[in-house]
Amino acid sequence: MIVCIAEKPSVAKDIARIIGATTARDGYMEGNGYQVTWTFGHLCELKEPDDYTPMWKHWSLAALPMIPQRFGIKLINDEGIKKQFATIEKLMQAADSIINCGDAGQEGELIQRWVMQKAQAKCPVKRLWISSMTDEAIKQGFQELKDQGEYQSLYLAGLSRAIGDWILGMNATRLYTLKYGQNRQVLSIGRVQTPTLALIVNRQKEIDNFVSEPYWVLATIYRDTQFTATSGKFTSKEEGEKAFSTIAGKPFKVTDVSKKKGNEAPPHLYDLTSLQVDCNKKFAYSADITLKLIQSLYEKKYTTYPRVDTQFLTDDIYPKCPQILNGVSQAKIMSQQKYLPLIQQLATISKKLPKSKKVFDNSKVTDHHAIIPTGVPPTGLTDMEANVYDLIAKRFISVFYPDCKFSTTTVLGEVINEDGPKPEKIEFKVSGKEILEPGWRVVYAKDAKNADDDDASDNANGNADSGNGAKKEVVEERTLPSFTKGESGEHQPTLTEKWTTPPKYYTEATLLRAMETAGKFVEDEELRAALKENGIGRPSSRAGIIETLFKRHYIRRQRKNLMATPTGIELIDTIHEELLKSCELTGIWEKKLRDIEHKTYNPADFINGLKEQINNIVIDVLSDNSNRRVTIMTEEDLKKKPAAKKTPAKKAPAKKANKAAAQNTDSQNVPAQPAPAADPMVGKPCPLCGKGVIIKGKTAYGCSNWKAGCQYRQPFSQM
């Protein structure tokens, strides 16, 4: 008898139907020489500390670090799991061979291997490796079964990850809880969750310590078009007024008019992170909700395997694309066959689907390709599932459309003042764009009318705010009047006072991008390359990490913004071991784990390195003689209304200078704002480091020496 083991009952039933195992038994299906059983995700886990020795049952600093001689696994303590495992064990011990039908990935491999080890399976094992749950994919997968030994390095990488998380998490959590937790709550430390929390805390500190400063922008309106000075902003009002005086009453002259045509390629297909980002921006879905929705669509056979980190397809998918598009065209979303016109229009553009390297690239795909529709027309979707399917379907359709073609017009101008001994010149510039052929943008034409956030290429081409404020420019239409080089005339100059603004708080969308592209936070080139591929955590785990931070009361949600709680802030401040809270930790781990998977690094060396690392951390923390403690937030604390933010008492600057006043040399700039009332705290020596002085942020006082490591922070609400 051949025993097949799947990761979920629903998946097992689909497989059983395809291979003819149609008789239902208690915990499995049987027929045609097969027995198809299932797990419920993880049935096994690594043993707890007290499973190794009674000395580790009670939390004690003296027992740290806890390093078992040999790591073992055990059944999760659940009656339903125990019953199902008994069925699996009985089937496997009598089996002639086993087919591992777990999810095709590192975690899926680990789940099934542990079950087979616990059941003491001795027979040969084959591996089913598929990227979708359609009947065709399952049939093809059974025709192309692999020997499980081909995936041994994948299993070893997953096992090393689990053991590493145990060594770090179990020891560091007990260490920090006992040392700094006031015996009120567990202070959870994790390889992924702690660097993620540090991202949120550090961003919040940047905002709290931010001091808004004024600057001035010189512009002028010529023929109802606003030109901006190319010299940039002025940090001094006097400099701005001087430049304004130079151009007031002098003619404006157009010095150059240039046009340049360009193309904008369709956005990349979705991987899990980019899908979660878009769902958060467009529908305010959390990363965890999006993962559940796309997992549901996958299990219903409407989309391909979701837990992926690539945005490319393999070449063998290309011949199947016409059939997939045909299936998508028949889909009815909210009672509308909305994709049929788009696919029909695609057929009029080209007789054969284009095959672009930006879509099909074998070198960019490892275990699974990007998330795409399977071609099975969806029925009975919830509104939330329909929203997610709509994103995936439109993205897939759009990659076969031509590029969007546009024309960029740049107009340069100048104002020359020859009244003085030496002529003075101020140069200006304005740019506009005109879409010549919308190309793939027709797929998103209706979406673009709804809101600015619905722009199709935002995030998809890496345009999302990833934590440093950088955002790639996208094509937005702005048509300029026709200008001629050499023309001149009157203009209306303005000098506008503005204020610098702090960074934005993370949302789930921008945090996911920061987790994915964490390479920008480290200096080492090799680590940066590893982080670009793997980021902080894996695509499938990031949603869970964010949810864990909420459950631990380390962060809270204020509208769409993610805010660190006092517990979260103080925990990060308490952790002096940079390796625990920096992106470099994950970079080091991910690179070594990837090397294990590629058979170029020894798992034993990985584990031994972690043992040495945790031993050093324990020594360092135990030698800390300070009386630092972490404030523990309770559920009731989080329910209390946050204190209102206090900001420096200054009026918002005027958005635009008065045109008439701008032409008057006696009133040639925006009126100066009244100076904020003097704050007696500001400027005093820092009571913590003694090197900096106290500065005033948006919600708290801080130290001017904060970038150098001073952690002084006094919230306004505690004054």
Which ranges hold each PLM region?
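Conserved short loop/turn motifs at secondary-structure junctions
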Residues: 1, 102-104, 183-186, 259-268, ...
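Metal- or metallocofactor-binding catalytic centers and their adjacent structured scaffolds
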Residues: 237-270, 276
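Basic, low-complexity terminal or inter-domain segments flanking catalytic cores
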Residues: 2-3, 118, 287-288, 309-719
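Active-site phosphate-binding and catalytic loops of NTP-dependent enzymes
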Residues: 23-28, 148-153, 174-178, 205-210, ...
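Phosphate-interacting basic helix/loop segments used at nucleotide- and nucleic-acid interfaces
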Residues: 72-98, 199-200, 278-279, 391-397, ...
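C-terminal or mid-to-C-terminal helical accessory/interaction module adjacent to the motor/catalytic core
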Residues: 80, 93, 135-216, 220-222, ...
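Intrinsically disordered, low-complexity regulatory segments
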Residues: 1-162, 166, 170, 448
